[in-house]
């Protein structure tokens, strides 16, 4: 079997406030991905500036940091075959108006500034984001009893 990879997924403050945490986790679990870490926290502005450092020169950066700091987030690490790419497909487009029904953003969002969820856009970004949000000992290694029913 091919190597499993990990991705970082964060439910943003609007997703938390709207009670979508369970629905989002359910979708990743039902797909067959394995949750290996999860935190419920209010991220500091400095932490968020580091997370979004690639966007620091964009005009929306201050508003993005303020929005992400406006309430709690659920930070997660999911593992599975092609989880980065598949996770991004499950999320839908960054702009919910461009997202298809059946995707998280297509089903639950209207505006880009309130798009409820973040997902790593590459394996390299995932590694960086996981390292930023979690200590190595917070990533739990276990074999899911469903593993053999999901993977050949």
Curated annotation (Swiss-Prot):
One of its GO terms (molecular function) is transcription coactivator activity. The keyword Transcription applies. Expressed in the base region of the oxyntic and pyloric mucosae. Its EC number is 2.7.4.6, 2.7.13.3. SUPFAM superfamilies: Nucleoside diphosphate kinase, NDK. It is found in: Cytoplasm; Cell projection, Lamellipodium; Cell projection, Ruffle; Nucleus. Its main location: cytoplasm. The active site is at 118 (pros-phosphohistidine intermediate). InterPro entries: NDK-like_dom, NDK-like_dom_sf, Nucleoside_diP_kinase, Nucleoside_diP_kinase_AS. ATP binds at residues 12, 60, 88, 94, 105, 115. Disruption phenotype: Impaired activation of the K(+) channel Kcnn4, resulting in defective T-cell activation. Pfam families: NDK. The keyword 4Fe-4S does not apply. One of its GO terms (biological process) is positive regulation of transcription by RNA polymerase II. Keywords: ATP-binding, Cell projection, Cytoplasm, DNA-binding, Kinase, Magnesium, Metal-binding, Nucleotide metabolism, Nucleotide-binding, Nucleus, Transcription, Transcription regulation, Transferase. GO terms for cellular component: cell periphery; cytoplasm; lamellipodium; mitochondrion; myelin sheath; nucleus; ruffle. It comes from the Eukaryota. Hexamer of two different chains: A and B (A6, A5B, A4B2, A3B3, A2B4, AB5, B6). Interacts with CAPN8. Interacts with AKAP13. Interacts with ITGB1BP1 (via C-terminal domain region). Interacts with BCL2L10. Major role in the synthesis of nucleoside triphosphates other than ATP. The ATP gamma phosphate is transferred to the NDP beta phosphate via a ping-pong mechanism, using a phosphorylated active-site intermediate. Negatively regulates Rho activity by interacting with AKAP13/LBC. Acts as a transcriptional activator of the MYC gene; binds DNA non-specifically. Binds to both single-stranded guanine- and cytosine-rich strands within the nuclease hypersensitive element (NHE) III(1) region of the MYC gene promoter. Does not bind to duplex NHE III(1). NCBIfam families: PRK00668.1. Belongs to the NDK family. This is Nucleoside diphosphate kinase B.
